[in-house]
């Protein structure tokens, strides 16, 4: 069984907040993680096994949903247990009740570790909870598997993770072909069942075409007008569809650098299908050889690196990219939460080659934003200095450094 790296902050937040929400796409492992946390809390009770076991409800199951017909009474009956509500966006009325229950228990002296909410769609969960549970709820995002969660003894694991993506069932499939079939079925189920359950009335075929077009244009600057013309819809419709895919945590819009630099900057976001395995499934790429021969290979690699890094970045990190009208560019700018001494700006260039070289435009861009650190991540597995004060770091090393920063912040 894989140990998810966010389990430490999840248990920490349950010690501090009455309610914690795990957000992540379907099949990312939220339910498994919730049960692992519940088991750990039970074992770490006043004495081993003394804490009451958690109570789990899957709100997509009619029988479990029916138990919340009178949520106030239900929560009162189980006041001594951690209540886990899976797919909580299926019961939107419960948020207002949770607020009253939490406040009542606070007055009685209970302050933390009461509710664990799991949601596959930030659209509903964030909108419903931002006001009702303000100050009472902490959020944790669970991404599919990332490199720091793989067995350290398996040298081939990162390559398989890039090809298959991080959804547990896809990554752990018995073969590349079986993994591809799983991902293709995942896409179909999302389009034909899951999205309609959330309410939006969007033709499945239209959304599939858009998703596939985004995969073809992985890591490119968004051209909404071209997408709209290709699909025969308006620019506003493209924006609405993109909002949906982003809110479902399936697509990322990486915003451009927003501060003044004295240069004319590209102002549209770059767009990424967040899971590399879904990129490859949308394009029918089932093997490493097929991927390496496809034009998307560079964009796929860039998106995969970015998702792995952001999964480890400390809370409060702001991510963007930098590009001027004349081509000076940084693939990823991380504004890390720093001390009172000022900004911590990491400029990260992403290269697939194991012998990376840098353009003059990268150094110009780093000067433009006054980057405090200049980094290159490539397929090479060694750390070494490069000209111009640039450090080359393997992906795993940089992820571990970011992760250590997050753990230090949690311990503060």
Which ranges hold each PLM region?
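P-loop (Walker A) phosphate-binding loop of NTP-binding proteins
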Residues: 25
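Conserved catalytic/switch belt of AAA+ P-loop NTPases
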Residues: 95-117, 131
């Amino acid at each position: 069984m894989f140990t998810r790296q966010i389990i430490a902050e999840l248990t920490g937040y349950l010690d501090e907040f009455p309610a914690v929400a795990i957000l992540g796409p379907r099949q990312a492992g939220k339910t498994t993680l919730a049960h692992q946390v519940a088991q750990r809390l039970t074992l770490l009770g006043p004495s081993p096994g003394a804490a009451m076991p958690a109570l789990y409800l899957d709100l997509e199951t009619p029988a479990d949903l029916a138990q919340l017909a009178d949520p106030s009474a239900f929560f009162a009956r189980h006041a001594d247990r951690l209540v886990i509500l899976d797919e909580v966006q299926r019961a939107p009325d419960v948020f207002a009740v949770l607020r009253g229950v939490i406040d009542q228990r606070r007055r009685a002296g209970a302050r933390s570790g009461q509710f664990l909410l799991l949601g596959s769609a930030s659209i509903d969960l964030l909108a419903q909870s931002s006001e009702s549970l303000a100050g009472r709820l902490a959020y944790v995002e669970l991404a599919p598997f990332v490199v720091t969660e793989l067995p350290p003894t398996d040298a081939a694991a990162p390559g398989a993770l890039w090809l298959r993506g991080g959804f547990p069932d896809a990554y752990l499939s018995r073969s590349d072909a079986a993994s591809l079939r799983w991902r293709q079925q995942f896409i179909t189920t999302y389009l034909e069942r899951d999205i309609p359950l959330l309410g939006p009335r969007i033709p499945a075929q239209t959304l599939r075409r858009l998703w596939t077009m985004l995969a073809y244009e992985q890591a490119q600057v968004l051209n909404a007008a071209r997408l709209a013309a290709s699909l025969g819809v308006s620019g506003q419709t493209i924006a609405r569809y993109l909002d949906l895919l982003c809110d479902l945590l399936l697509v990322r819009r990486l915003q451009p650098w927003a501060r003044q630099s004295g240069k004319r900057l590209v102002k549209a976001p770059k767009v990424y299908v967040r899971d590399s395995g879904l990129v490859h499934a949308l394009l029918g790429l089932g093997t490493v050889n097929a991927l390496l021969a496809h034009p998307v290979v560079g964009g796929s690699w860039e998106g995969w690196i970015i998702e792995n890094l952001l999964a480890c970045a400390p809370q409060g990190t702001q991510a963007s990219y930098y590009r001027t009208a004349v081509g000076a560019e940084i693939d990823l700018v991380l504004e890390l939460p720093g001390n009172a001494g000022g900004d911590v700006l990491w400029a990260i260039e992403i290269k697939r080659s194991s012998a990376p070289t840098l353009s003059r435009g990268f150094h110009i861009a780093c000067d433009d934003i006054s980057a405090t650190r200049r980094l290159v991540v490539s397929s090479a597995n060694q750390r070494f200095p490069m000209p111009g004060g640039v450090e080359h770091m393997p992906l795993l090393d940089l992820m571990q450094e970011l992760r250590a920063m997050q753990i230090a912040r949690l311990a503060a």
